[in-house]
């Protein structure tokens, strides 16, 4: 399984790719799509093009993205929503199922507490993936999203397996 995590942003969109094999997580790639265009349509196209390029290079089988969170600034929320929508649409166009996780869920899965600081997320991502240095914040967040997705999908598989067993016992 190859998982693509996306940390959407209107100025920087982070991405992280991990591979899971034999219940072990391996680092594949991470980075940031730097948004340099001025107009909103061109900025959104730049996000879509960047994600498409990542999909073409790394061929993920699953994708995950951070849910939108509360913003003090309404315009900031709108811009983030646009970036997130373009990212989700690009993933869907490329036939990837998209799972969504809150910042609290992601931090809980990676650090063990939903109130973790960004530096703690970076440190744990570095440790879990055996990286020689801490990844940049946006890339670390995207890798954390991918790791959270793996842990969540593993838990869901156990739960669905348990329900099949219990259904057999009832019959």
UniProtKB/Swiss-Prot annotation:
Instruction: Please give the cofactor(s) recorded in the UniProt entry for this protein.
Output: Mg(2+)
Protein name in the entry? Crossover junction endodeoxyribonuclease RuvC
| Transmembrane regions listed in the UniProt entry | none
Q: What is its EC number?
A: 3.1.21.10
GO molecular function annotation: crossover junction DNA endonuclease activity; DNA binding; magnesium ion binding
Q: How does it assemble?
A: Homodimer which binds Holliday junction (HJ) DNA. The HJ becomes 2-fold symmetrical on binding to RuvC with unstacked arms; it has a different conformation from HJ DNA in complex with RuvA. In the full resolvosome a probable DNA-RuvA(4)-RuvB(12)-RuvC(2) complex forms which resolves the HJ.
Q: Which UniProt keywords apply?
A: Cytoplasm, DNA damage, DNA recombination, DNA repair, DNA-binding, Endonuclease, Hydrolase, Magnesium, Metal-binding, Nuclease
Recite the UniProt cofactor note for this protein.
Binds 2 Mg(2+) ion per subunit.
Q: Which reaction does it catalyse?
A: Endonucleolytic cleavage at a junction such as a reciprocal single-stranded crossover between two homologous DNA duplexes (Holliday junction)
Q: Indicate the residues that form the catalytic site.
A: 7, 66, 138
- Please list the disulfide bridges: none
Which superkingdom heads the taxonomic lineage of this protein's source? Bacteria
GO-annotated biological processes: DNA recombination; DNA repair
For binding Mg(2+) 1, which residues are annotated in this chain's numbering? 7, 138
As for subcellular location, the record says: Cytoplasm
Task: Note the Pfam families from the entry.
Answer: RuvC (PF02075)
Give the similarity note: Belongs to the RuvC family.
Which residues does the annotation say bind Mg(2+) 2? Answer: 66
GO cellular component terms listed in the entry, alphabetical order: cytoplasm; Holliday junction resolvase complex
Q: Does the keyword DNA damage apply?
A: yes
Instruction: Give the protein's biological function.
Output: The RuvA-RuvB-RuvC complex processes Holliday junction (HJ) DNA during genetic recombination and DNA repair. Endonuclease that resolves HJ intermediates. Cleaves cruciform DNA by making single-stranded nicks across the HJ at symmetrical positions within the homologous arms, yielding a 5'-phosphate and a 3'-hydroxyl group; requires a central core of homology in the junction. The consensus cleavage sequence is 5'-(A/T)TT(C/G)-3'. Cleavage occurs on the 3'-side of the TT dinucleotide at the point of strand exchange.
């Amino acid at each position: 399984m190859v998982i693509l995590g996306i940390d959407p942003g209107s100025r920087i969109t982070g991405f992280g790719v991990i591979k899971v094999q034999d219940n072990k997580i391996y680092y594949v790639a991470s980075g940031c799509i730097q948004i340099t265009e001025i107009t909103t349509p061109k900025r959104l196209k730049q996000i879509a093009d960047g994600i498409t390029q990542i999909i073409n290079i790394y061929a993920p089988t699953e994708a995950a993205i951070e849910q939108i969170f509360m913003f003090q600034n309404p315009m900031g929320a709108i811009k983030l929503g646009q970036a997130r929508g373009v990212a989700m649409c690009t993933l869907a166009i490329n036939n990837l199922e998209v799972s969504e996780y809150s910042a609290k869920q992601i931090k809980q899965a990676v650090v063990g507490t939903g109130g973790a600081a960004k530096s703690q997320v970076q440190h744990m991502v570095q440790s879990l993936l055996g990286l020689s240095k801490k990844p940049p914040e946006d890339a670390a967040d995207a890798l954390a999203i991918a790791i959270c997705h793996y842990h969540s999908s593993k838990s869901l598989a156990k739960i669905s397996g348990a329900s099949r067993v219990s259904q057999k016992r009832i019959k």
